[in-house]
Amino acid sequence: MSFVLPLTASTENQTQNPALFIFLGASNLARSFHGLKYCIERCIFPRPASFVHAMGPGRGYVSRGGILNAVYSPILNCGILEAVRNKKIKDQSVVALITDIGNDIMYGVSSEKIINGLQYLLNSLGEFKTNIFITSIPVDLENDISELHFHIIRQIYFPKSPVKYSQASNNIKAINKFILQSSNKKITAIDDMKQFCGIDKIHYSILKSQSAWCHIAEKLTTSLSTNVSPKFKTSELVFSIANNAARILLTDMLGIIKKTKETF
């Protein structure tokens, strides 16, 4: 009996340690960020959670990108890694999500440069003993999108992009190969997000968005020894979309409202 109490107390203390979540992505993440945050907070309650994020429509990891006059610095150069070094506290668990990879391809960045950037990011996050989750690019151009479909999407989302169909296809294959090969005990590759994509094959379908983020939230929280099933409420999805639109307009475009300390 004398050995049971210390073990139980130790386990309880471990599960009550604060957790820091690092979210990196583009439009999919930005559109559902607040709902994902609330979903995770419920799953790990009463464990304290804090969040930092770098996201935005059209955002790249190694290249500047954005939408209209909302232009974002590359995620690798936005200062979030330095902030985590200063923000992390003793015994804090760190969980990182790297998602929405692919915009850099359409900005003409080579697969080699993108892979080098991702490797640097993985190495840097590894310094914090981070549980890292990284989603592959959920599209295979040759099997999922015709060349005509590709040109239509490029004209809508990346009208100035010179990238050709074959070039994008080869880059996606190279990057996804790197992501899958990077998987280890601390890095989990999430390679099954295609099922949630909408007609453009880039963004998650509005009808499947909640399921997509519940799927990801379950992986993130399971790494913290949590067995509560994530629930992403419809009201939270609506709020997330509205909040994202307001942030893009009032903060990123007009600069009326300042960014929070958690935003990079």
Write out the residue ranges for each language-model feature.
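Substrate-gating cap/lid alpha-helix
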Residues: 144-192, 209, 214, 218
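A short, charged/proline- and glycine-enriched loop
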Residues: 14-20
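Conserved SGNH/GDSL esterase-like catalytic core that processes O-acyl groups on lipids
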Residues: 20-113
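Histidine-centered active-site loop/cap adjacent to the catalytic His
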Residues: 171-184, 197-264
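Active-site segments of SGNH/GDSL-like serine hydrolases
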Residues: 98-106, 124-169
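Well-ordered, non-membrane alpha-helical segments in soluble/globular domains
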Residues: 73-84, 110-122, 165-178, 209-215
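A structural signal for short, well-ordered beta-strand segments and their strand-loop junctions
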Residues: 22-23, 97-98, 129-136, 186-192
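Short catalytic/ligand-binding loop motif for oxyanion handling, primarily in non-cytosolic enzymes
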Residues: 30-33, 104-107, 140-146, 196-201
